[in-house]
Amino acid sequence: MIHDPAQLEKERPDRLRVLWLSTLAFTLMFAAWLMFGVLGVPIRKEFGLSDVQLSWISALAILNGSLWRLLAGILADRYGGRLVFTLMLFFTAIPAYLVSRAGSYEELLLYAFLVGFAGNSFSVGIAWNSAWFPKDQQGFALGVFGAGNVGASVTKFIGPALIASVPASGYLGGLIPGGWRFIPFLYAVLLVLMGFVLWFGTPRKDKRPGQGRPFLDMLKPLRYVRVWRFSLYYVVVFGAYVALSAWLPKYYVDVFGLPLHEAALLTALFIFPASLLRPVGGYLSDRFGARRIMYWTFGIILLASGVLMMPEGHIVLYTKQGAKEVMQFTMGVELFTLLVFLIGVGMGIGKAAVYKHIPTYFPQDVGAVGGLVGMLGALGGFFLPPLFAYAQAWTGLPQMTFFVLFLLAAISFLWMHLTVLKLLQQEAQHLKNDFELKGDRPC
């Protein structure tokens, strides 16, 4: 990594081009990755699918968007993010187009799985931007790039209008498909165009921190426990984000009886802070330190989910005089939305804080470490919805969705805090067994 101020200033325009174009590309990839959440309704109607069959389409896309993040990050470090990201854009365009031509449920499953490859672009962008930005700017840069998560809402906003406006027969004699099939076709075209823009719009001389290093050598950092601890943090702030983005519309409909379009809009009040506040989290991590921001993150999530997991009923209070007071507890949609918004705020700043740790501890291995952390975090988005469903089925309480989140956040917080205490003891050995105040020193 370059530390010469003159060289850093000279490369500033190149850094910014990498940042903004990679962010735009990632937003598009994220939109294509999660497009089946909105397309599910017309797909189910056309193919006569059950809820379980439909759920597998999105699940396979999410799964494949997780599996290759480690490898993608390593390849970006070794061959440069410009090449790897461009190839991923072109590759993802192929199954996106094939989705628009799918004629059976089995074909949809296969093509959705392949489209899911788009989710792995996150690791490429993280490694790429880390290679270009100096340490004191990495938190903000990675936060800006990660804000491409807002692509999760793109199809929610443009999808229904486009599906309704494009004729079912399409255009040019069906060459451009109509109805729901127009959306994956449009994404396929945009992905190809974005591939050319990224290739010709970013510096030809790329940064390759892993060039020439043996592949196994790039995997060595994965033996450190802190890598797996960071992964658990990311399950909380990203895996749960992906899971709740898919789960909340159903929750609003089932628990509060809202129509689907209102449920989708209220879900966006969770998605936007969880995505767009990522640059803020990066800036705060640069200024105050990533660990302190993680304390804030877990505090917000624990507080909000702790209230949300409370079932409706009565709270019984006893005074000192023995009097009994009974208070009815109900969760209105306004309070629920506010608390979910707060969880989104915590996740938004927390995602950037997790990734701020990585170039600090592993400056030469951001691709491998960031890839593993991203992979396990995204796998959380695959496994958490079934956990939500089982918790609700076992208890009969929809609020148990947030008990799962509370438990996961509590475990992560406890692990982090015990690690911090251990670090403090190592830095101040003399206080380990002698921590009482001496004389008149103030506390």
Swiss-Prot record:
Domain of life, per UniProt, equals Bacteria
Give the main location: membrane
Gene3D superfamilies linked: MFS general substrate transporter like domains
Enzymatic reactions: nitrate(in) + nitrite(out) = nitrate(out) + nitrite(in)
Q: Which InterPro entries match?
A: MFS (IPR011701), MFS_dom (IPR020846), MFS_trans_sf (IPR036259), NO3_transporter (IPR044772)
Q: Tell me the null mutant phenotype.
A: Mutation has minor effects on the ability to grow anaerobically. In contrast, narK1/narK2 double mutant is unable to grow anaerobically.
Provide the GO MF annotations for this entry.
antiporter activity; nitrate transmembrane transporter activity
Q: Does the keyword Transport apply?
A: yes
User: Is Membrane one of the keywords?
Assistant: yes
What are its GO cellular component terms? plasma membrane
Q: Where are the transmembrane segments?
A: 23-43, 56-76, 79-99, 108-128, 142-164, 182-202, 230-250, 255-275, 298-318, 329-349, 368-388, 401-421
**Membrane disposition:** Multi-pass membrane protein
Where does this one sit in the cell?
Cell membrane
Write out the entry's keywords from A to Z. Antiport, Cell membrane, Membrane, Nitrate assimilation, Transmembrane, Transmembrane helix, Transport
A Gene Ontology biological process term: nitrate assimilation
Homology family: Belongs to the major facilitator superfamily. Nitrate/nitrite porter (TC 2.A.1.8) family.
* Physiological role: Probable nitrate/nitrite antiporter that may be involved in nitrate import and nitrite export during anaerobic growth.
Q: What is this protein called?
A: Probable nitrate/nitrite antiporter NarK1
Which organism does this sequence originate in? Answer: Thermus thermophilus
